[in-house]
Amino acid sequence: MDTGGQHWGKVIWHAYEHLQVPVSETDFRDAYVHAERTLGKNPIIQPDFTFYKTLETKIRLQLEYLQTSYITPLTSYILPLTSHLYEATVAETSKSREVLLSLKKQYPMVLVSNFYGNIATVLKEFKLDGIFDTIIESAVVGVRKPDPQIFTLGVEALGMQPDEVVVVGDSMDKDIIPASKAGCHTVWFKGEGWTNDPVDESPAGKVITDLTQLLVNSE
C-alpha cells in the first residue's frame, strides 16, 4: 500500500544509495534491524505521530546507531532521507488509494497491520481514513504478524468465515503463510524483498506485481 510491494528496509536502503549516504549495506541492515527492535520494545512512537514523524524517528535511530562506527557525520542526512522517502510514500499511497476506493465499492475491507499505535493518524494523513471498515493494529490488539491470530481477528471483524476472505500482503512470511494458516485465500503482492533469496510462491493463491491487478481479479 505504501511501498509498491517492496520491503521497507530495501526502500530505505535505496534512499541511502540515492543520497549517497557513506555507509555499507551490511551496516545499514544492522542499523535497520536495531531501529525496528528499538521501536518495537519502547513506546517511542506516540498515537499522534504522523507518518513523516514516524519515518524521521526511524531514520534518526538508524543514523545514530551507524554513527558509532563511522567518522563521517551522518545526522545531517536525517532530513534529506526523511523528505525523499516521504515524497515517494505520498505518491505510492495516492495510487493505492484509488485502487482501494474502487475495491471498497464491491467489498468490505479490514486493514491488518504491524504498527505502533498511530495507524489512525497515518491513515488520515494519507487520506485513507474511512476506506477500511475496521483496523487491526498489532500495538492495539497485542498480536503481531506472523501470528495467524491477527488475521483471525480481521476475519472476525468482517463477520465472515475465513474461506470467504482474501488477504493481500507483500510479505510471504508475515502475510501470506500465516493468513493461509488462518484459513483465508491469499494474494501475494510481490516486490523486492529484504534479501535476494528466491521465494517459493506456492503458498500464495495468486501473485500480483501491481496493486491495480486486484481490480482485474475482482471483476
Residue ranges and their predicted role:
Residues 1-97, 105:
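N-terminal helical cap/lid subdomain that shapes the substrate entry/recognition surface
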Residues 3, 26, 68-77, 97, ...:
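Asp-based, Mg2+/Mn2+-dependent phosphohydrolase catalytic module
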